[in-house]
Amino acid sequence: MTGYTLTCPVCNKEFSDSYTLTCPGGCQGLIRAKYAARQITLHDAPGVFKYMDWLPVTGVLRTRAEPVCFKSEGLARALGLSDLWIVFSGYWPEVGAFAVSGSFKEFEAFPTMQRLSERTKGIIQVSSAGNTGRAFAEVSAETCQPVIIVVPESARDRLFTTSPAHDTLLITISGDYTDAINLGSRICTLPGIFPEGGAKNVARRDGMGTVMLAGTLAMGTLPDWYLQAVGSGTGGIAAYEASLRLIADGRFGTRMPRLLLFQNEPFIPMVRAWQEKRREIKDEDMPDAEQAISQVYSDVLTNRTPPYGIVGGVFDTLIATNGLMAGVSSADAQEAGKLFSSSEGIDPDPAAAVCVAGLMRAVRSGVIKPDEKILLNITGGGYARGRKDLPRFVKAPDIMVSKETPFEKISAKVQEWMRYYA
């Protein structure tokens, strides 16, 4: 098992990991993992941990969840593409996809929980619009590791697992994803609770980066294009960082893939900022944010505070990859989802349908050429099949609050629950 250190992209200092989320020197940038293994070797390890050369862990958890890549036939034929590859993250046994939560967020959750257990003692807190929370609840249910999850009240039904999540404390808040993030941040001020960290967590980014690893290893070379629908944009950052490692590996080509990232109209703050080549997201990039969020097809793509302008964030990633961003309408996403289901034989997550719609537009407009090598990240799917095959336990909220609930009341309930894990 190879080791790693952490590095800061601002001051370039190297330091050891103690579940570190930021530069010890106070720099404002996304720290990265620097792995001892320059070339990746696949390990005989469960699921996503086969890529542990480039994951910030030394041990593994039992899982079958990993990204599965294959060359498209049905969708490629429908769009007139000769070299379209799909990385599928979700539940689809026929192709070997066993992310039972239905989302690529499992690829983040497993290494994040393992990293926490190896590097510190405490309980992890996750704020989510649904998919991330469900993935962490699934890992908790499988490993008995405690986790505190905060989601908007509208997402409570998305918190289901394949075995009872006895060690998950689920808090719902009336509001949206940003309200869940804000409450989660306050909960993390309590002793013994650690934020999962979002884009700042190298385990989350490098877990997501396994999508690019799986795709490149299946294709034998880096793609010309990498496509994904994004809310925070962390998946795009992860794809770029994985590509840097694959180029340094020396066996998969030297040309950086171009990133094409999509947001769901009408909530497209990063698209607006990027079109003007601004590092900062302004209030006018998300006018009437709550109304816009209520109109999207995929509300997991609605982060109001994405890691866009931070050093090493989405803006820098798009600059480094000569990348593009575009908005996709909900109507186009729904039609694209139907096309994907009929042509490939599995239902995509709404966010993945947004990505398919973006691909269709890019092909029609000539941005993507028919013979280019395309890696399409289907970030979730197989829910219909999962409902048939898998046990389902919907996690009932343990604490239900509004934005007006005094934090002292919430804090007391959280600390009472934590006593079971002291």
Curated annotation (Swiss-Prot):
A single GO molecular function term of this UniProt record: cysteate synthase activity
InterPro entries in the record: Cysteate_synthase (IPR022401), TrpB-like_PALP (IPR001926), TrpB-like_PALP_sf (IPR036052)
Classification via SUPFAM superfamilies: Tryptophan synthase beta subunit-like PLP-dependent enzymes
Pathway in which this enzyme or protein is active: Cofactor biosynthesis; coenzyme M biosynthesis
Keyword annotations of the record: Coenzyme M biosynthesis, Pyridoxal phosphate, Transferase
Binding site for pyridoxal 5'-phosphate: 131, 379
Catalysed reactions, semicolon-separated: O-phospho-L-serine + sulfite + H(+) = L-cysteate + phosphate
Names of the cofactor(s): pyridoxal 5'-phosphate
Entry EC number(s): 2.5.1.76
Keyword set includes Transferase: yes
Binding partners and assembly: Homotrimer.
HAMAP family: Cya_synthase (MF_02109)
Protein name: Cysteate synthase
